[in-house]
Regions:
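Short linear motifs at protein or domain termini
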Residues: 1-109, 214-219
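A general structural signal for well-ordered alpha-helical segments in protein cores
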Residues: 24, 89-92, 100, 116, ...
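Hydrophobic side-chain positions on well-ordered alpha-helices
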Residues: 30, 129-133, 151-153, 196-197
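Short, solvent-exposed positions on alpha-helices
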Residues: 137, 157-161, 203-207
């Protein structure tokens, strides 16, 4: 293959990747805003026509959403928006507790009851941006960043990486819990949490997660 052919192939691959990103981003946003409800079908042909791309591109975009657990591929039913049912909620919150509570415990061992500003800064910044969020989709992203910042305080690379892998599932959680909050109450609750993870340690984070779980599943 000539250098010109190689350059052309690379450009084509880049364009295909960009198209996949564009479709995945658009459908992801519709899922995370609730425009596409749980169990809604994601149809390749309709999406290809809507976004002006090939069905192959749409298929790759849908596969990305499946990998993010925002969609599920089901035999004979195709790809559908993931259901956020009781079992899914409890499993997600148990995993979050395993990671976030342990991260706060480690941070407490590192810093004691007063974490340094260098560590608190990213969480405080996230709270300020959460308060200034223009819409709930932005709030979902910043809420996730706040919890990532708490986990990062542990300094544990493996825990930080595992928590980051929750990705879009954490955004989806706030979509479902947000009917129980105003933006103001969400910010206020997390400001208190930032103080209490220092003074009370992992118990504060555990209580926070259990409270939000009860909002969705009761008990």
């Amino acid at each position: 293959m000539s250098a010109l052919d190689s350059a052309g192939a690379a450009a084509a691959a880049g364009q295909a990747a960009t198209a996949v990103d564009r479709v995945a981003d658009a459908v992801r946003a519709e899922i995370l805003t609730g425009t596409l409800s749980a169990d809604a079908p994601l149809r390749e042909e309709a999406a290809a026509a809507r976004y002006g791309v090939s069905r192959h591109t749409v298929r790759a975009a849908f596969q990305r959403l499946v990998a993010e657990r925002l969609a599920v591929a089901m035999p004979y039913r195709g790809v559908r928006v993931a259901s956020f049912d009781r079992e899914t909620i409890i499993a997600l919150q148990q995993l979050r507790a395993a990671l976030e509570v342990e991260a706060v415990r480690i941070a407490g061992d590192r810093f004691g009851p007063e974490w340094p500003e260098l560590v608190l800064g990213p969480a405080r910044d996230a709270l300020d941006r959460l308060a200034a969020s223009a819409d709930w989709l932005e709030a979902e992203r910043v809420h996730a960043e706040f919890h990532h910042a708490l986990v990062a305080a542990s300094g544990s690379t493996r825990i930080i990486e595992a928590h980051a892998a929750l990705g879009a599932e954490l955004l989806l959680f706030l979509l479902h819990v947000r009917p129980h909050y105003t933006l103001e109450s969400l910010v206020a609750e997390h400001r208190v949490l930032l103080d209490e993870v220092q003074s009370r340690g992992p118990d504060a984070l555990r209580d926070h997660l259990e409270h939000s779980t009860r909002l969705l599943v009761g008990g």
